[in-house]
A protein has these predicted regions:
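Inter-helical loop and helix-membrane interface segments of multi-pass membrane transporters/permeases
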Residues: 118-134, 162, 180, 204-245, ...
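Hydrophobic core segments of alpha-helical transmembrane domains in multi-pass membrane transport
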Residues: 46-57, 75-82, 113, 139-151, ...
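Membrane-interface helix-loop-helix modules in multi-pass membrane proteins
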Residues: 82-162, 245-276, 280, 296-315, ...
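N-terminal alpha-helical transmembrane segments of multi-pass membrane transport
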Residues: 2-129, 150, 154-174, 178-225, ...
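Flexible hinge motifs at transmembrane-helix junctions and intramembrane kinks/re-entrant loops
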Residues: 62-70, 151-152, 207-211, 246-258, ...
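Membrane-embedded translocation segments of transport machinery
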Residues: 368-464, 470-471
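Residue-level detector of conserved catalytic or cofactor/ligand-binding positions
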Residues: 475-480
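Short, non-helical or kinked segments that cap or interrupt transmembrane helices
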Residues: 64-74, 164-169, 250-258, 409-423, ...
Length: 480
């Protein structure tokens, strides 16, 4: 029997396809056996990975506006360290390391897209007060809310729709973790790639053999085209951006590139062609130049960027509309569980799950904590503003949770920036309507956006962890 188990290291044939009527999925780790999962080894390594990759994700996110998904490289490292330590039955431990470590990217994504704006605005409005407590609590409570809101949708995405969603990142991470059962050699390519990337950036930064940001302005004809036709091309040659494109994948890297080309080759020169002799300052009275007098970079900053933000926000609305059927189906499943009979005490290991009553209580308790946070620290004791804010945050976070999970399940990337921008727009409009304006209003909108952004980012990352646990047969309630 042992020999059969050793030979069958690998995912079953029906792991990535819909199950036939009456067919069951049998994971690698037997549901009737116990395996080492949450212990000192896995938790400490998971925390170490979270610290390391939080710094990397924050650097890339603040620099290029994209946060890479850390699950795959962390899975590779987990396999490598467990192999080096010659740990037996390390698959469950490696999943926990990957799950804890991957939280780094999702929390960072929730913070860097909104909270740095507080410091940017503080430079313009010195009366604004920004403190670490606001950023910490908004990220903490937002992350908890995202997990609690996602759990009712777990069965729908993970088991009921088995084989219908590709889960690209979860698939890659699972394959890496499974390969670790045969040896820890998967970590070698990651270390080798890190050395190459570090050497590449060292040469650029230290010796300056070429500029990290290449632009067509470096040559005479490029400068002339930029001034006359408002056409300019730029490319970042850094190793970090190159690696990010590899992780995102050719398809979505091409989509991002196409969006940039449309902005710089169509929108920017198009505005100069259509409105060249006009001063468009309806939303920024400080502008006094005509469009033709501006450089392409200024046109991009003042106009094209806003058009792109509007497009991203609209994509978030479309995501909710498309996910409405999923919301109804998943809520229906959760309602059935809440109204159903009590679950048997002796259930197999992988069927242990938190009851919907616990989830409902936890969600209400977390929402109350966020309400208190808004009341005492953000809204300065205003009851109306606090109630309106929590209704907005809870409603938007719940609706967008399915959008985040659906995006991760299909394409492996979370459109959290677009959903956050939509939140900021709605929060700003509604809070102004109820009388919250000025510096306090801006801080409130950004903190609300931070809570929602972290919740959505955590929901997207958590659905990946749950799918990996389903494929490999981990206990759902043990995942962080």
């Amino acid at each position: 029997m042992k020999q059969e188990e050793e030979k069958s290291v690998g995912l079953p044939d029906n792991a990535f396809r819909p199950l036939k009527p009456g067919e069951q999925y049998h994971p690698i780790m037997s549901p009737n056996k116990k395996y080492p999962e949450v212990n000192l080894w896995s938790v400490l390594w998971g925390i170490a990975m979270a610290v390391l990759f939080s710094a990397a994700a924050a650097y890339l996110g603040l620099k290029v506006g994209q946060v890479f998904e850390a699950a795959i490289p962390i899975a590779i490292i987990a396999v490598g360290v467990s192999g080096a330590a010659k740990r037996k039955n390390a698959l469950g431990e490696n999943v926990i390391i990957q799950s804890i470590g991957a939280c780094s990217g999702v929390i960072v994504a929730g913070a860097i897209f909104t909270l740095p704006a507080l410091y940017i605005l503080q430079d313009k409005y010195p009366e604004m007060t920004v403190n670490f407590f606001q950023m910490f609590v908004s990220s903490l409570l937002g992350g908890i809310l995202g997990i609690l809101f996602l759990i009712p949708f777990r069965k729908y995405f993970v088991s009921d729709k088995h084989g219908e969603y590709p889960f690209p990142e979860a698939t890659a991470s699972t394959q890496v973790l499974v390969s670790g059962e045969k040896g820890g050699s998967q970590a070698k390519p990651l270390l080798f790639a890190g050395l190459i990337g570090g050497l590449y950036d060292f040469i650029v930064a230290t010796f300056g053999w070429w500029n990290e940001n290449f632009t067509t302005r470096v040559c005479g004809w490029g400068e002339m085209v930029a001034e006359k036709a408002k056409l300019v091309m730029k490319i970042n040659t850094g190793a970090a951006v190159l690696g990010l494109g590899y992780i995102v994948g050719l398809k979505y890297a091409a989509i991002i590139c196409a969006g940039s080309l449309v902005v710089w080759l169509v929108i920017v020169p198009g505005m100069a062609l259509l409105f060249g002799d006009q001063v468009l300052n309806a939303w920024n009275p400080a502008l006094t130049q005509t469009i033709s007098e501006m450089s392409p970079e200024v046109i991009f900053k003042e106009y094209a960027k806003s058009i792109g933000i509007g497009g991203i926000a609209m994509a978030g609305v479309i995501g909710i509309v498309r996910s409405w059927g999923i919301i109804k189906s998943a809520v229906g499943l959760a309602a059935k569980e809440m109204g159903g009979k009590k679950v048997e005490a002796n259930v197999i290991r992988t069927q242990k799950d938190l009851s919907m009553k616990v989830i409902a209580f936890g969600s209400i308790f977390t929402i109350l904590l966020i309400l208190l946070f808004f009341f005492f620290d953000v809204m300065h004791g205003n009851v109306l503003h606090s109630i309106v804010a929590i209704l907005l945050v809870a409603g938007i976070a719940f609706l967008f949770t399915t959008v985040a999970a659906n995006a991760i399940a299909i394409v492996g990337t979370n459109p959290v920036s677009g959903m956050t921008l939509m939140t900021l727009i709605l929060a700003s409009v509604v809070m102004v309507a109820v009388g919250l304006k000025g510096a306090t209003g801006m801080v409130a909108a950004l903190v609300m956006g931070g809570v929602v952004c972290t919740a959505l980012s955590m929901a997207g990352g958590f659905i990946t962890d749950l799918k990996i646990g389903y494929w490999l047969s981990l206990i759902h309630i043990s995942e962080p």
